[in-house]
Regions:
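Small Cys/His zinc-coordinating "RING-like" fingers
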Residues: 391-394, 398-405, 411-434
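Extended non-globular C-terminal regions
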Residues: 461-462
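Long, leucine/valine-rich, helix-dominated scaffolding and oligomerization segments
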Residues: 1-288, 296
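Cys/His-coordinated zinc-finger cores
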Residues: 394, 400-401, 409, 432-457
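Residues that form ligand- and interface-recognition hot spots within folded domains
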Residues: 227, 236, 426-429, 437-440, ...
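Extended, low-complexity, charged intrinsically disordered regions
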Residues: 291-398
Length: 462
């Protein structure tokens, strides 16, 4: 999908705030198309995140607030719509008339279309943020918006924690009889799309927390004040992305043969590592008995299996053990200090606006009409994006296979000696990275030291 620079600038220029009650209008669909194509362009030209002063990045940052408002609005619409669907489903269960059932099916089909489009819209904006937040040099320009984005992230994580894998799990198609395939997919598609959003929310949080040193003090204070550890640690325990022997990986449920951690769980562990051990966070996080007991819940997960996949967790384990044997007496509740608080004004403004106009919003959602021309145009965009993604996946798979062949060839050429050098200290190595099988180390200590340099390469093999 070849999008030219001039087209990208045009798509960005076309981004404007759409009125709440104009969602799903013809004007909104044009906006939606622009968002989708901007996201595709950025991921196809992701080298721009490393270039200081790139015009393309500067252009998209000027529209950061517009995209943020749209993201938060779509989130609240999703939340409101989800509540309404639950009420409707409860009423439908009482209806048995065949004609009514037919009408219900038609209505459900209609709802599925705009539900899908709405979730796709939210995901496209979130994907865009996830990518640009990898760039260190943009944080100063978006500093005032981070607290609103964090409020969105926090609200989603709270919702995610209230769910379970039962809501999302569908057996892989290869394991289903034909009679069950359509039934299963129709039943869980909407829920799986929500799961994808929750996972992207965690990825976005990871990108922010990795750069916590770039945030101003007031924002860090607010992040600490949210006490997100009280959400993240229970999420690690609940694991909504894991169901029996399956994990949700690369947007599908797969059999977890080697009991590896799902990528989303690795992301959570690295976020926890930073929030618990980072000096900036430690200085601002007032330890209480309740908070201490929450962190100690992680103790039972500390083992060699975790260290092999995430070597830095050994350092976290040391901290947790010190916390466990500590004789320090922590207060039951945190002290109340007078601090300058930051309110997520954009988030609260949109929330209040939607609640104030709840009846009109629900009426709008119940009376959406999408013309065939608009639906056809959007479908063409989706198909192009799908084909583009499929092409990239095939290319990555081929590269991975070629790398594997080259690695095997190199190993054969080395003969019986099989001598490798440590990725960290360049001494002779005998230990192999259990995840990517590409890096070697002389000791666990060297593997831990090299992890933050190696992890990006390592993750590309998973």
């Amino acid at each position: 999908m070849d999008i030219k620079d001039i087209e990208f600038f045009e798509y960005v220029n076309n981004l404007k705030n759409v009125e709440l009650l104009d969602m799903f209008s013809t004007k909104w669909f044009e906006y939606h198309k622009n968002v989708v194509l901007i996201n595709v362009y950025l991921h196809n030209n992701n080298e721009l995140i490393d270039v200081v002063g790139d015009d393309r990045m500067g252009h998209i940052l000027k529209k950061f607030e517009v995209l943020l408002r749209e993201l938060i609005t779509t989130y609240f619409i999703r939340f409101l719509n989800f509540e309404e669907q639950i009420k409707k489903n409860n009423k439908k269960m009482l209806k048995t008339d065949e004609l009514k059932n037919k009408n219900i099916e038609e209505e459900n089909s209609h709802n599925h279309i705009y539900d899908y489009i709405s979730l796709y819209h939210e995901m496209a904006i979130l994907n865009t943020f996830e990518l640009i937040l990898l760039s260190d040099h943009i944080y100063e320009q978006i500093d005032s918006y981070i607290i609103n984005l964090f409020a969105y992230i926090y609200s989603n994580l709270v919702s995610f924690l209230k769910t379970s894998s039962d809501e999302y799990f569908v057996k892989p198609i290869t394991e289903l009889p034909i009679s069950e395939i359509l039934k299963e997919e129709n039943d869980k598609t909407h829920n799986i799309d929500r799961l994808k959003i929750y996972i992207n929310v965690i990825n976005t949080l990871r990108n922010i927390i990795d750069r916590i040193h770039l945030l101003n003090n007031t924002v860090v204070n607010k992040i600490v004040d949210y006490d997100i550890l009280l959400i993240l640690i229970p999420l690690i325990e609940k694991k909504p992305w894991k169901h029996d022997d399956y994990i949700f990986e690369q947007n599908e449920w797969i059999k977890n043969e080697d009991n590896a951690l799902a990528t989303v769980e690795k992301q959570l562990w690295i976020i926890l590592y930073t929030l618990i051990l980072n000096r900036i966070c430690q200085e601002k996080y007032e330890m209480t008995n309740y908070r201490r007991n929450n962190i100690l819940k992680l103790r039972k997960y500390m083992n060699e299996h975790l260290y092999e996949q995430l070597p830095p967790m050994k350092t976290l384990h040391t901290y947790i053990e010190h916390l466990y044997i500590s004789k320090s007496v922590f207060p039951e509740n945190k002290n109340s200090y007078l601090i300058i608080d930051v309110v997520p004004e954009i988030f609260d403004e949109i929330k209040n606006d939607i609640l104030k106009n709840k009846k009109q919003v629900l009426s709008m959602l119940n009376n959406i009409t999408i013309s065939r021309e608009v639906l056809g145009s959007i479908s063409e965009v989706y198909l192009s994006v799908y084909e583009f993604d499929h092409q990239i996946k095939k290319s990555k798979k081929k590269t991975k296979e070629n790398n594997s062949v080259n690695t095997n060839k190199d190993e054969k050429e080395k003969g019986g000696d099989n001598q490798y050098t440590c990725n960290n200290c360049k001494e002779m190595a005998e230990l192999q990275c259990s995840q990517c099988k590409q890096a070697y180390y002389c000791s666990k200590e060297c593997q831990m030291k090299d992890w933050f340099s190696h992890r990006e390469v390592c993750s590309s093999y998973t």
